[in-house]
């Protein structure tokens, strides 16, 4: 985190695209004594936000879970655009209570296939040129990523049934 921008930072004006956090995830963070109300922000489901989620999860019904007139929670950010839980050496949350998206990143499941985000600011992306290398660097395996992805979707009210389990 001390090297510069990370996945835990957003550019000014891009806050609407921050990934949503579920109510159970908020409760877990609060229950662990690691965050109060000021760590979470309730924001409207903007058209850009819904479109971005639809791009990331094209097989799921984003509009039902995040209706146009609705809202969702996300982690708060500082004036500099950093997640409120980002410290000088990375995330200050215990791994067990981190939002599922944060535990997944930069790994992802897209149309049933494992992949990873190749954002320039991703430090892991600098060192990994294959999915196998990324999984090893993140200390995980494909089945764990699929499980986390299903868990994240379920917490957000996104029905995955057989759509993303291939």
Where are these regions (language model features)?
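Short loop/turn segments that flank or connect secondary-structure elements
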Residues: 1-166
């Amino acid at each position: 985190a001390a090297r510069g921008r990370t996945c835990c930072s957003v550019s000014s004006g891009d806050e609407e695209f921050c990934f949503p956090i579920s109510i159970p995830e908020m409760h877990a963070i609060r229950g662990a004594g690691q965050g109060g109300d000021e760590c979470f922000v309730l924001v409207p489901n903007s058209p850009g936000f819904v479109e971005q989620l639809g791009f990331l999860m094209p097989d799921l019904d984003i509009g039902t879970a995040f209706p146009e007139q609705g809202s969702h929670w996300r982690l708060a950010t500082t004036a500099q655009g950093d997640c409120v839980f980002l410290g000088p050496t990375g995330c200050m949350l215990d791994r067990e209570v981190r939002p599922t998206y944060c535990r997944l990143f930069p790994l992802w499941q897209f149309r049933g296939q494992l992949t990873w985000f190749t954002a320039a600011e991703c430090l892991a992306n600098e060192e990994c040129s294959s999915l196998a290398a990324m999984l090893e660097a993140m200390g995980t395996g494909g089945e764990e990523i699929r499980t986390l992805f299903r868990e994240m979707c379920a917490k957000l009210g996104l029905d995955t049934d057989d759509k993303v389990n291939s």
